[in-house]
Amino acid sequence: MPEVETSGREIHISSDCFEAVIATEGYTSGVKSGSFLDKRTGARDLGHGLDIADFLLEPAEGKEQDASSPYQFGDLAHGNIKKRYVELPQICTKARKLPYEIFRGDDFVAVRTHYTWPEATLDYQPGSLWEQTLVFPDGQRYFIASDRITSANNCDALIFRLDMPGHLKHNAGAEFSDIYLSYEGEIPSSEFLEDFAPDERHLYQRDDTALPERMIRGYRVRTESGTDPWLVGMTLDPADVSEAWCHQRGYVCFIQELGGRRIKDGEKFGAAYVIGYFDSIDAMNEVYDLYRGKSGVEMNGDDEHTTWEWA
């Protein structure tokens, strides 16, 4: 079983293959920036963290913006993709502190956090629940994650925004060699030297009549050893993803959006992911196909004698 230790505001995980830290206060959700270490190659994540949670949105066509919390668009950061906030604030920067539970199984440890949004815009009410479960197994260079939303509103197209696998900070491409988008292919780091809007290049928007075979997004980390593994996030059911960005705005922005479908008060939506290091695209595809179609994770038992299963 991986080792787990709570130290102040952080949960430290160490397995035979990786190390990771979860921050429960400050900049929260997902795995902390720079803490996900691949013990085989020495690679670390290069961004603001992995599986980082934001807020709830909806398409804005034909709807007025909330004057007190307008969604900005028409710039390099957001392009001309019109959205409107439904519930706020942004979890990663504004929640400040997340309740958590730690679970221990025979060959894994898991951490579950949650947050209830306290603010809503215009016609909506606050109270939607976000739950995130991170499962860290022994013997693998990846972990399994799930985000689940329980809506407090009726909405024609409710969207949950997150970073998947996570934004990529770099200095003129020195830290990474390539981006990989399964629905597009490999893209050299040289394409990300100057800022461009999300709707200029590499924008994914779901077409239910032509879903991609896999939804894998990530980057190849340059290492001193030259082994250069891929760090990717795999959303295991492509139908769960409504939109995904991959653009440069001072860093490579890996925004991903889930849902985008009609939902009623009390209903749930979300996705499940594999996030980790791989030596090749073939290796990614092999693991993806092992778990293909999964959309959630559930914990069973108590915190000392736990099993987990796909939801």
Sequence positions of predicted segments:
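Acidic-aromatic substrate-binding/catalytic surfaces of carbohydrate-active enzymes
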Residues: 8-120
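Residues at beta-strand starts and edge strands
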Residues: 9, 16, 30, 107-111, ...
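Acidic, contiguous internal or C-terminal segments within carbohydrate-active enzymes
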Residues: 101-172
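Broad, structure-driven detector of short, well-ordered beta-strand segments within folded domains
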Residues: 17-25, 126-136, 229-235
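Short solvent-exposed loop/turn micro-motifs enriched in small/polar/acidic residues
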Residues: 3-6, 93-95, 127-129
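Polysaccharide-binding surfaces and accessory modules of carbohydrate-active proteins
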Residues: 46-47, 154-228
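Beta-strand-rich recognition/accessory modules
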Residues: 2-14, 198-311
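Short, solvent-exposed loop/turn segments at secondary-structure junctions
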Residues: 18-20, 27-28, 118, 150, ...
